[in-house]
Amino acid sequence: MRKIFYTFSLLILLPILSFAATYYVDDSGSNGDGSLSNPFNNFSDALNAAQPGDVIMVLPGTYSQDINTERSGQPGQRIVIQAYDPANRPLISTGGGALSIDHSYITVDGLIFDGEFDGSDVVKISSGGDNTILRNCEIRNGTKDGIDMNEADDVLIENCEIHHMLGGSLSNQVDAHGIVATGEQNLTIRGCNIYYTSGDCFQTDPNRDYPLWDNVLIENCTLWTGPLPADAADWNAGEIPGENAIDTKINEDAVGTSYRAKITLRHVTAYGFVPGYINNRAAFNIKEKVDCLMEGVVAYGNEIGFRLRGPGGRGGAYITMINCISYDNDIMFRVEDDLEVLKIYNSTFDLGSGNEYFDNVSGGYDPNGLDVRNSLFTGEKPDEASHSSNLLANSSFFIDMSGHNYHLSLSSPAINAGVDIPEVTDDFDGNPRNSGSYDVGAYEGGTITGIGDELAGDEVANDFYLYPNYPNPFNPGTRIAFRINRAETVQLSIYNLLGQAVRTLVSGQLAEGLHNYTWDGRNDFGNPVSSGIYIYRLEAGSFTQTRKMHLIR
């Protein structure tokens, strides 16, 4: 009976298993049957052949044809289009849209899309493209948007580099965004590096249309601009494009309803939005009827770090900031139009080369909705930070204030000087905030040390300790520190998420003490590795400790 059951089960599974196939596409030669030895020479045939669960492997080369999806995958059976060799990614270079996704459960992994500065969006994800995953791709050289999304839900954009979206010119402002989304639900943008855009790195919703967008998560991303290294489109070398890192908009008809769009920014770094090109250039332009949570956000070197805007014809934003760091902005906060809710908890602000912390315009903020606690301010403490848990800080508070390492020194007056805040459960690095002993600022004390610092707490008791790398996320390099309390044979290695060894930083006998090494984002052969999450592991005798770090290109 059991044998009959197994046979029956196998017969049921065989039709499902038989659907799984791999097809290959090459950029030259005659058209084949899609096998590795005789690949297709065009995407259309491969996409027509591919069924849910199938994989299309794109061989290295330059393709002058675009990719347009033909059918949807299914939950658990995605249609995957990916680079055959991630170290030699295929280039899709077309005069126009290079990728169009109109179907659901599609994954695109490891391709380069070049729009050749044609007048089209480089990548389009349309209303049929729910549950799209776009991963490990480079999207470049457009005069419109890098990724244009329209009513596609549950989309993941991960570990992508998006750059040189340049519409108009310095004297003729035309928006070209890195990613623009309209009517989306449950969008996640993770581990992306977006730069050199004439519009915003990310904007939602430019059309202020229906359906209303909601639930956007942007995490572990770097959004920036700076002088162009070379002429591009109608822009000249040295000119600085870009409006904002992030800009939010909604449909004005939502103002009288209970709707309030949710956007979460977690470990997002934004810099380079200096004066020029537009008035009030800000890294974060958060406005209209949104609820924005910023956790571990870093803003530096901007005209305005945070432009936060209250009720107008389209409503006003609610803002909560936790474990944020901001420095060297001309204006840290420009607060407008009686902003109703602004909560700032456990953050570190260094005025540095900036001029002022708060520029309150057209009513500024509603005092009843302002709550600033457990935060550090250098240079001066603004009136908005009157709560006793906010401290005026100087270089003695930090490991290396001049180097913008705002981890607390072991003798920092910020240690145990805070108040408990239920909304704050850990620090910038993910270390827990313990009730009754909150530190002030973005970091809990004792989580990382500099050379010459002594250790505290559990780190003293342990013979070995591997510290969180700094900075994290990082580009191009990061420091990894560890302490050993006796001479020992040590290996410090870096691995990708597949468990493959990428780089060995240390292998040999070391004396006791604190040791510091820098990883430059290269493998053992000296080649740059791609953006993504990496594991670093310390082995010393029988001791092993691992941590994660995030490289952003």
Q: Can you annotate each of these PLM segments?
A:
Residues 57-60, 72-122, 133, 166, ...:
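Right-handed parallel beta-helix/beta-spiral solenoid domain characteristic of secreted/periplasmic
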Residues 512, 527-553:
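C-terminal tail/sorting-segment detector
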Residues 76, 93-99, 117-126, 141-149, ...:
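Extracellular beta-strand/beta-solenoid scaffold signature
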Residues 65-66, 89, 95, 111-118, ...:
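Surface-exposed loop/turn segments connecting beta-strands in extracellular beta-rich domains
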